[in-house]
Regions:
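Conserved recognition-core residues within compact binding domains
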Residues: 1-74, 80-171, 175, 180-183
Length: 184
């Protein structure tokens, strides 16, 4: 199913599901850039090639109403999957709003494998089909790590309570004199 097709420019058409149709009716080959976004190269009426058109922007330009073209200049993938270019998954946003929908810390999409990777402190926790599964794994591992480190700190605190550390005294005295909060 290719969805509804609408005219783009130079005789090309774009479908609501993210396919680009050539003037002769065949589909344009799409490639994936290093950030996971589909892109195409199109030939103008003079036969010159122009590359790097991002498919999600072409789909949004034709199918998604932009309520404020003066400020909404970026296209957001609602499900955070850059390979999903269906028009119902796209919306126009400002750059700052688009950044709010970026991947949560610890979850990254791997376009080559079409999977989400959960990662904590440079350690891969696993690969998952959906963002939600990867994020859930990340949160669980983060909580376990935090709890174990917290317990360890509490256990060591009783043992180290009476030990004087000159370096800590130096930093606390320096911090007290510093007008700018330079030490936490």
């Amino acid at each position: 199913m290719i969805g509804e097709s609408r005219p783009l420019f130079w005789g090309y058409e774009v479908t609501s599901c993210g396919l680009i149709v050539k003037p002769d009716g065949t589909f344009v080959t799409q490639s994936v850039n290093n950030k996971g976004y589909s892109q195409v190269a199109l030939r103008n009426l003079d036969g010159q090639w122009f590359g790097g058109y991002l498919v999600h922007r072409l789909v949004a330009h034709v199918f998604v109403k932009n309520p404020r073209p003066d400020i909404f200049r970026e296209v957001d993938h609602i499900d955070r999957n850059p390979a999903n270019n269906v028009f119902s998954n796209l919306r126009w946003l400002t750059k700052s709003l688009n950044l709010l929908n970026t991947n949560a810390k610890g979850c990254h999409y791997i376009p080559k494998w079409k999977k989400w990777r959960a990662q904590l402190r440079r350690k891969t926790l696993g690969y998952f089909k959906t963002y939600e599964e990867a994020h859930e794994c990340y949160l669980k591992q983060r909580e376990e790590l935090f709890n174990s480190e917290y317990r360890q700190l509490c256990e060591n605190r009783e043992h180290e309570k009476n030990i004087r550390r000159p370096s800590l005294i130096f930093f606390s005295e320096t911090a007290a004199r510093c007008p700018i909060p330079c030490f936490s």
